[in-house]
């Protein structure tokens, strides 16, 4: 995304959020709650957080959450909401154009102990706790910062190399961590994109586009699921979610 595109995108999304009342307790996405409810909390990254329904839910479950959005309005609102709900110590909201920058995570770009040291060997996702830093660093030569990265409906009308963003998100995981990508699999009546020719890539197509090394990442789920959704005006419709769940194994 070039400078003009990025400015236009920020202005557009700021306008979207500014035009509607601020949410006081936004709801989390159902695909997040059903996937994450039984996981032990750790460090999470919420890409395209909006006003923060997923972020706040994760924080209430004990996760430390880095929440990212292109819109300064959304980031400011989420920061205020987290504080008002007593979750300010668990939520860090940051403005990013994901085509140009990416959050480093709670311990910086090289993980909890920098480029030379392993993370906590008592991580419940990795009970054996690899002692060799080279084993922990994996194929990128760096330690991931997150146990969970979520990207719900990360669609935009502006130029964005989404596959590159999701690839970077997968690399930001610690070994054992999960990348949850939920996309629109159908066009809702209230969608901003009513193009009848629009293609909704399947979860497998998304996985192929991300092009991760199967020696280090495993697709655990690739489903198309139906649900009843409610639009901004209160109307309801049957929609399809495309759900992709990838685990980093090395």
Enumerate the predicted regions with their spans.
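Conserved SAM-binding motif I beta-strand of class I
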Residues: 64-69
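Conserved SAM-binding strand-loop segment of SAM-dependent methyltransferases
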Residues: 87-100
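Conserved beta-strand signature within the Rossmann-like core of class I S-adenosyl-L-methionine
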Residues: 176-184
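A short, conserved alpha-helix within the catalytic core of class I
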Residues: 156-169
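Conserved SAM/SAH-binding beta-strand->alpha-helix loop
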Residues: 71-73
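Conserved class I S-adenosyl-L-methionine
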Residues: 1-39, 42-50, 187
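A short acidic, Gly/Pro-enriched loop at the edge of an enzyme's catalytic core
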Residues: 104-108, 139-148
């Amino acid at each position: 995304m070039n400078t003009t595109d990025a400015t236009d995108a920020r202005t557009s999304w700021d306008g979207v959020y500014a035009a509607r009342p601020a949410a006081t307790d936004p709801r989390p996405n159902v695909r997040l709650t059903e996937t994450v409810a039984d996981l032990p909390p750790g460090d999470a990254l919420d890409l395209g957080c909006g006003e923060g329904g997923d972020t706040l839910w994760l924080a209430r479950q004990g996760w430390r959450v880095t929440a990212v959005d292109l819109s300064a309005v959304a980031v400011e609102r989420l920061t205020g909401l987290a504080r008002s709900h007593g979750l300010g110590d668990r939520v860090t909201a940051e403005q990013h154009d994901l085509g140009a920058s990416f959050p480093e995570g709670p311990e910086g770009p090289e993980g909890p102990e920098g480029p030379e040291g392993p993370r906590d060997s008592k991580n419940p996702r990795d009970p054996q706790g690899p002692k060799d830093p080279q084993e922990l660093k994996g194929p990128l030569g760096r330690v991931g910062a997150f146990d969970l990265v979520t990207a719900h409906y990360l669609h935009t009308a502006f130029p964005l190399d989404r596959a590159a963003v999701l690839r970077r998100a997968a690399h930001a995981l610690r070994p054992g961590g999960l990348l949850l990508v939920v996309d629109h699999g159908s066009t809702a009546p209230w969608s901003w994109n009513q193009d009848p020719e629009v293609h909704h890539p399947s979860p497998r197509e998304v996985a192929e586009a991300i092009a991760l090394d199967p020696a280090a990442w495993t697709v655990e789920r690739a489903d198309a699921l139906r649900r009843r959704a409610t639009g901004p005006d209160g109307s309801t419709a049957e929609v399809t979610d495309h759900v992709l769940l990838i685990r980093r194994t090395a």
